[in-house]
Each structure stands twice: as structure tokens, then as C-alpha cells.
Amino acid sequence: MMSPPMTTTLMFILNYAIISFHGQPSGISWGNHIETAEAAAILAMANRELRSRELLLWTSGSTHLLLQPILPLPLCLPFPLVPASIFKKMMLPLSAFSFWM
């Protein structure tokens, strides 16, 4: 079964994750901490939207999630990076996503 196409929102989320990347990749596991409640809510929505096994999301604290692509990032993200500041300006309040939780 094919995954739905990536939406603009999901592309911003994943680009933000790359920009926020810290630590060393281990094999095909890449960890990115998203440390705001708003980003966590958007990531949760995007994970349901994507509906594939390309991304695993789980909580690693009360206010952030760990984004862990299974595939190497170049295969997961075949589009240009955008500045994190642009993504942050586009983020909606956490309450906007509460009905998805």
C-alpha cells in the first residue's frame, strides 16, 4: 500500500526536525528532539496523516517527542530544507490540535 503524498505541513515538520538534529546518526536511526508542545502536537497529527512505517513517534517527556525515521534521511526527505524560524512562525497553538489527541 502506498503512503499518501507528503503535505506542506508535514514537509515543514520534517525540515524542522532536520534543522533541530543533534547527536550522531547510528546506522539508519536518526534522532531529533522537538522540544515544544506545539511541535509535539503537530508531529502527532502528521504521524497519523502519513499512515506509513516511515516514521516512528513516541513520547520522551511531557513536552516533546522523539522523531525517528526508519529510512536514512536522504531517502525520507527529498525536498529542500527550510529555516526553522519559518516553521515556528507557522505553528498553531497546541489547543488547535487538541481534538486529534
Curated annotation (Swiss-Prot):
Annotated signal peptide: 1-23
Residue interval(s) of motif RxLR: 48-51
Induction line: Expression is up-regulated at the earlier infection stages.
Membrane topology qualifier: Single-pass membrane protein
Keywords annotated in UniProt: Host cytoplasm, Host nucleus, Membrane, Secreted, Signal, Transmembrane, Transmembrane helix, Virulence
Cellular compartment(s): Secreted; Host cytoplasm; Host nucleus; Membrane
Membrane-spanning segments: 67-87
Major subcellular location class: secreted
One Gene Ontology CC term in the entry: membrane
Family named by the database record: Belongs to the RxLR effector family.
Stated role: Effector that acts as a broad suppressor of cell death to interrupt plant immunity. Inhibits cell death induced by cell death-inducing proteins, including the PAMP elicitor INF1 from P.infestans.
Free-text note on domains in this protein's UniProt record: Has a conserved RxLR motif that acts to carry the protein into the host cell cytoplasm. Lacks the 'so-called' EER motif, which is found closely behind the RxLR motif in most of RxLR effector family members, but the presence of an EER motif is not always essential for the translocation of every RxLR effector into host cells, or for inducing a hypersensitive response.
Name of the molecule in the record: Secreted RxLR effector protein 64
Gene: RxLR64
